[in-house]
Structure formats: C-alpha cells, structure tokens
Regions:
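Long, contiguous binding/interaction regions
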Residues: 2-77, 81-195
C-alpha cells in the first residue's frame, strides 16, 4: 500500500478563515468559474424538479445539489454548484427568479462565504493499513465512525478541495465506497438569505 504525502497540515488545504480565495475558485476555462448559488424556494412537491428541469433544458450542468427545509417549514434552501462564465451564471439566476416557487436567489461567490461538504468513505484497513488509515483520518481531521475487522468508515467535512485531497492521499485500491453530500454554503458576516 502506498500513500501520497499530499499535505500533512490540513490548514494548507483549508484556509484558516474558511474562505475560498478568489484565485482558487476559478477553473479558468474561457472565463468559466465555479459558482455556489443559494436558492430559497417554497417547500412544495415539484419545486425541485422544476429547478433541475430548468438547468437541463438550457444545457447547464449541476456539479452538486443539496436541498433541505429552513427554519421556516414552508421554505427550503437549495445550494447548487455550477461552473460557468459570469454571463452564464447571470442567465441561470434570471431563469431561476422567473420560477414561481423561487423566493430568492443569491450567488454566494459574489462575496465572502463559508462552504462545507460531508463525505463518508469506507476504506479497506487490514494489517499495517489500519494504523495508516487512522493517521490519515487524523491528519485531515476526520472521524472514524464505523470499525470492522477489515474496514474503517471515515467521516470528513470541509470544502471540496479538502475532500478531494483526502481521496488523492489514500491508495485508490483501499477505497471501497464513497458518498458525498455536495456543497452547502452560507454568506459570511451579516449576509442573510431571507424573505
């Protein structure tokens, strides 16, 4: 089993203040950039499918999508991660605002924001691998949440870059199963998404 010592200090992966610097947000392919769009919408049947249908009909790609009720049970908050130029994201925002169920749309990447994603990963952990997998979990501030004689299941949270770095650091042959939630984001400071 070989491990790539990608980063022994997780602060090198996740900025200390949880911000994603502007120069690390860009994919820089013809001005394409990763955007996190936060949508407040009515919590009713069919609302999610109409938003996804809008993206599909116009050929926009959704990298990740999370949705859950808010503190107001009549509203849900949807977080969409998509890649596109500023013009494309502006068009997406305009189209989203036209949907009757949509209450408010904000591109979080226009200001300071905090982003988190959850990953559960089941790894083969036998013999000498067990201690190495535990060490890797500790380095990335993960938690071992399930243990068997042959496996560890590790919970990791952070931005997408941190989770990707963990996947690169462990031996691919040791990865048995992975599930990720997709990004959730919230504006920093006084920025609040409310009606």
């Amino acid at each position: 089993m070989s491990f790539t010592p990608l980063a022994l200090n997780p602060d090198a992966i996740v900025p200390q203040n949880d911000r994603i610097p502007a120069n690390r947000r860009s994919y820089d392919e013809k001005n394409s950039m990763r955007h996190i769009i936060s949508v407040l919408l009515e919590n009713e049947p069919g609302a999610l499918s109409r938003v996804v249908g809008l993206f599909s009909a116009r050929g926009y790609n959704i990298e990740t999508l999370t949705v859950a009720p808010t503190e107001d049970p009549s509203l849900s908050r949807m977080t969409i991660v998509s890649v596109g130029s500023d013009d494309v994201i502006e068009q997406i925002t305009k189209h989203l605002n036209r949907l009757i169920e949509v209450v408010k749309v904000v591109d979080l990447t226009e200001g300071d924001f905090t982003e988190r994603e959850l990953m559960l990963i089941k790894l083969r952990a036998v013999g000498k691998e067990r201690e190495e997998m535990k060490r890797m979990a500790d380095i990335f501030r993960g938690r071992i949440i399930d243990v068997t004689e042959r496996t560890y299941t590790i919970e990791l949270t952070g931005n997408a870059g941190k989770l990707d770095a963990f996947l690169q650091a462990v031996d691919r042959a040791a990865i048995l199963e992975t599930v990720r939630t997709g990004s959730s984001g919230i504006g920093r400071g006084e920025r609040i998404l409310r009606v």
